[in-house]
A protein has these predicted regions:
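Strand-helix-loop interaction patch of compact alpha/beta domains
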Residues: 1-39
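Domain-scale recognition of soluble eukaryotic interaction modules
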Residues: 2-3, 54-108
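Residue-level recognition of conserved beta-strand positions in structured domain cores
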Residues: 28, 45, 57-59
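Short, charged/polar surface micro-motifs in flexible loops or helix N-caps
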Residues: 31-32, 48-53, 63-65
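Hydrophobic/aromatic-rich, well-ordered segments within soluble, folded domains that form packed cores
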Residues: 36-51
Length: 108
């Protein structure tokens, strides 16, 4: 988790750790495009064994879409969060925070 936090901080993101869930939260993430463009959210990434295993999806707060649709479900982080299950392709070729952020940018 510390290495992912170091990489995200190096590219300008403010982060917080939730160690009991092995989640690294990007604070004040601004959505760049799509129906939620310009909204600011928190994005949680599973980071327990980064860079060996990619995040299986993201945790988002506040909720942007209804739970139970498009692989979006309740998050263990609390009622204001939701979990978006999304596969991160090409992890074997690029195991970096930049690769994760490029992938997250396509979600919204």
């Amino acid at each position: 988790m510390d290495e992912l936090e170091r990489q995200l901080n190096a590219i300008g993101f403010k982060t917080n750790q939730i160690p009991e869930h092995k989640i690294l939260v990007i604070e004040d993430y601004t959505i760049e495009a799509g129906p939620h463009a310009s909204k600011t959210v928190r994005v949680g990434l599973s980071a327990g064994d980064f860079p060996y295993t990619p995040p299986a999806g993201i945790h988002v707060s506040p909720k942007l879409r209804p739970d139970g649709q498009n692989n979006i479900n309740a998050s263990p982080l609390g009622n204001e969060w939701q979990y978006w299950s999304r596969r991160l392709p090409d992890w074997g070729k690029d195991r970096s925070a930049r690769h994760i952020i490029a992938h997250v940018n396509r979600f919204f």
